[in-house]
Amino acid sequence: MDFTPPQEGYATQDALVCTIYFYAGDIIGDQTRSTGPHISTDSGHTWDHMAWDIVITNAIAVDSYGKWLYCACGNGVLSSSDGGRNWRLNGGWRQAEIQDVKIGPESPLVVWAAGAYGLFYSEDGAKTWTRPGDPQPFRYTDQVLPDRADGDHVLIGSETGLWVTYDRGSTYTRVGPDIPIRSIIQDSRNPQWFCIGTDGRGLWKSLDRGENWERVQGTGDIVNRVVQNPGDPEWLMCGLDRGVGFSRDDGLTWETSVDGFTDNAAVYALLFDKSNPQTVYAGARDGFYVSFDEGKTWHSYSDENGNVVLQNAVIFDLWQGDLYRGDEEKGSTDAGTLVVNTEPPQGEEHRENFEPGYDTRAKALIDYLVNNTEERLASLQEGQHVDLISAIAYIREGRANDALWDDIRAQFQDWGHSMFHSFPAICFYLYTKDYLPDDIKEILRENLVSHYYYRGDTENHWLMHYTALLLTAQTWPQSSASEWYTGRSTQENYDEALGWIKEWTRITSTIGQGEFDSPAYFITYMAPILMLYEFAQDPALKRQAGMVADLLLADMAAESLDGRYCGGHSRMYDDQVVLGAYDRSSPFHYLYFGGIDLTKDIHSWLITSVYGSYRCPQVIADIAHRRDRPYVHTEVKRVRNCMRYSDLLNPPVYKYTYMTPDYALGSLQGGILQPIQQHTWDVTWIGSADNTTLFSLHPYYDSYELAMFFPEDPHMLTASVQSQKSTYTNPDKLNSSSPYERIFQIEDTLLAVYNIPEATNHQHVTLYVPGCLQRTESDRWIIGHDGNVYIAVYHFGDGEWIDEPVETFPPSRRLKIPAGQTAFIVEIGSESQDGSFAQFRQLILDQAAPDLTTTDSGPSVRYTNRHGRTLEYHWDGDVRRLDGANWAFPSDMLFQSGFMDAAVNTGAISIIGNNASRLLDFNTLRIEETPVPSE
C-alpha cells in the first residue's frame, strides 16, 4: 500500500470529467464515435476524450492529488498515474464488465472494483487483483464503497441487495433491502451514516455503518444515483428513472424535477459544481444536462455556438477537480521481449489421411474470393473498401495492383476499434507480409500494436480479440509498453491472451460452448482457431488449436444434412433460419468433407482454411457422409455467462437431434438459453426448395432476458438491443428464446409446449411452414410432404394463417395462435420409414387425438405416436415421461451417439469414423487413433 505522493508545487488543471458508456443507437466498437472518459476544461462546453477513442466506461475514481485515476470499463480497469494523460489496461481475462471503481482510504494504490462477475481488490494501483473471499456470495455487483474511516469496512451493492464486509472481503454479511443497489454514499458529516439508491424501492439510509436500514420516503422507486452537496450536507439529490429528486432538509421532504429532461432521460450521474452550488450537472441515458437554479429546471448543455454537446451519450459518472499536470508517466520505452513455450506435446497429430479432392475444392474457393475482390475493386464507391481478408487471395494469387494498395492505405486512415478489425488485420498481415509494401507493413504494425481495440462481450468476440492480441505480440515482440495500446509489456499481453485461450478450450472440452452450434458464427470460431494452428509459435498451442478445430468440425459433421447444420442453435438470424443455402458453416462442409456443391454464401474468413496447413482427419469426414441409418445424437452445451438471475454461471443446455438420410429433427430443452437469437427446434429436410424447414417459437422479448446476459441497466437494455438487432421486438421474428417454452423430443416425435402469462410481450406462438410443403388440414392436424419427407403437426387452439411476402423470403405461411397454455405435436416420417404419404397420413389420423390439460401450474400434454410410444410433458416440475416412466436428458454425456462419445467434465472426446476412432485428450494434448472393428 506504500506510495510516494507527488512533490509539492506540481502543476494542475481544473477539469470536468465524464464517463461515456456509448452513444445510444451506435454499435460498440464503431469508429465514428468517441466513448470512454472525456475531459472538459471550459465547464462542459467542449470535450475531448482522455483515453483511447473507444472504451466502454461506467465509472471513474480520482485520488485527492488528481494524479491517480481509475476507470471501470468493459475490458477491465483502466489506470493512470499522471492525471489521465497515459493509461494502462488492467485486470486480464478474469475481469470483465466492471461497473464501479473506488479508491481506498489507505492509499491511492488501494482500489476496489465491482463488476458483473463479483468484487475485486488491488493494492498496487490496479496492476494485480484478487477476488477477496472467493467464492463470493454474490455475482453481479454494481457498486462498491470502502469506508473512509475504516478501510476494512466495505459496502457492496449487488443485484440481489447490499452486502457488507468488516474484514476487507474475507467474510460478507447481507444487510438492507433485497433489491438491486444502484448507488452508495457515505455522509460527509458522520462516517457512520450511509445512503443507498435502489432499483425498485427507492432511497434508504443507515445510521450505524450499514448494519440497519430504513427507507426514505418521497423519492420514487428507482434511484440510480444519490449525491450530497459538499457545501451543504443537508442538500441531497437523486437521479431517477426520469429527471431528479432533491431535498434541502436531509431527506425529510422531496421535490421532483423533469423540466427540460426528455422522456428517455434516466439520470445516472449528478455533480454539484464546486464553485457555484446553484449549478448542477447531470449525466443521463441520452446526454449531458445542466441546471443553473439548484436543480429545478434543466437543459441539454451546449457549446458557445448553441450546439448540443455529448448528445445521445450514455453518461454514467461525473467528476470535477484539479488534475495532476506534473511529469507524464508513460509505460516503459525499453524494447519488449517475449518468451514462448518451445516444448512440444507428446505423440503425433495423425493428419495424413483426409477427404480426397481437398486441393481442388480449396482452389475453387480461392477463385471465388479472387473474383469477388476483382469485382469489388472495380466498382468501389466513395467510402467503400475491398474486404481485407478477401484481398489476401487477390494478393497471393499475384493480382495486387496500385489501386488495391491505395485502398488498403485508405482503410487504415479510419480503422475501427473492435475485434472485427483487429482480427482481420492480423490475418491480412500474416498471410501477405511477404508481398506487402514497406509502408503498409508499418501501418499494420502501428494499428495492431498501438490502436485501441475493444474486447467485446461474447465468446466469439473474445476468441477473435485474444487470437489477434497473441499473434500481434508474437509478431512484434520488440514493441515497448509505451507503444502497446494496453500500456503493458509484450509478455503481459501474450500471457493474458494465452491464458484465456487455454481456459476457453478447457471449458469447451468439458462443459461445452456457450455460443454453440451456430451456422452464423461458426466462422468466427474456426477462423481464429485456424490462425492459431497456422501461426502460433508455441507447439502446444498449435496442437491444442488443431484439436479444437477437430472438435468443432466433428460437432458440425454429426448434425450435418447435405451441408446444412441441423438441430437447435444458440444464435441465428432470421434469414439464416429459413434459407438453407445461406448457412456459413456449409462451405466448411464443402471444403473438408466434400459431397456437396459450393454454396451461395462464402464468408471471406474461409481464407484461413484454404491457405492454411490444417487438414481435417478422414475420421471426421466419415461422420458427415454416413447417413445410411437413423441415429440419435445428444450433446451438452452451456448457457453463456449469466450475470444475473441464475444460481449457476453456466447452466447446462441439452441438445437432442434425430438424424436420418432424409431429414433431421433437433431441439434444445427450451427456456432462455441464449439471448435474442436462439433457435430452439426445427425439422430440416432434403426437399424441393431452399427453405425446407419447419419450426415454432414464442417471439419473446423482455429486459429480464437481456439483463441476464448483459451488464447494462435493465431499463435501457431493450431499446439498446433493438437499435442494434432490429428484429428483437418484432412480433413476426423467426428466432427467439422464451422462458415460456419447453420441448420434449423422442426420435421423430416432438412436443413444443407453451405457458405464456397474460402480461407477457407478444401473446402468441408462431408455426413456420414453408411453401414447398404440400399439405392438407384435418382435425387440427397439418399433414404434408416434400421430397421423401412427411410431416404432421397438431396444434391446440385456432389460429390465423399469414402469408410470407415472397420478395422477402422463399414462399411460406405462418400459423399465428393466441397462446396462453398451448402446444404443438410434431411427427416426422419418410418414404423409407413409412411407405407412401397416404399410409403415413392415415397412421397419424388413426391415433387418438393429443391431450392438453390446463392448470394454474401450467399445461400438461400427452400424446401416443404412430409407433405406440406415449410422450408426456408436465409444466409443473418440468417433468418429461416416456411410456409412463420419467425421462431425463443424458446430462452426464458431453456427446453421445455412434459418432461421438465424451463424458462431461473429462476433457476426453472420442470421434468414431468408418475405420478408425480418434481420441482428443485435452488434458494432455494427446491424439490417439485406433482401428474400429468392422461390423
Which residues fall in each region the model found?
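Trp- and S/T/G-rich repeat-edge/linker motifs of beta-rich repeat architectures
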Residues: F3, R33, D42-V55, R85-R94, ...
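Short coil/turn segments that connect the beta-strands within blades of beta-propeller domains
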Residues: Q13-D14, I20, K67, P108-L109, ...
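A short loop-to-beta-strand structural motif that recurs across blades of beta-propeller domains
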Residues: T35-I39, G76-S79, G118-Y121, G161-V164, ...
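Conserved Ser/Thr-centered positions that define the repeating blades of beta-propeller domains
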Residues: S40-T41, D63, S80-S81, S122-E123, ...
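Short coil-to-beta transitions that initiate beta-strands within beta-rich domains
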Residues: A51-A61, G91-G104, G133-D147, G176-D187, ...
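Ser/Thr/Asn(+Pro)-rich, low-complexity disordered segments
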Residues: P344-M464, P477, T490-I501, G594-E935
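Extended amphipathic alpha-helical segments with heptad-repeat/coiled-coil character used for oligomerization
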Residues: R543-W605
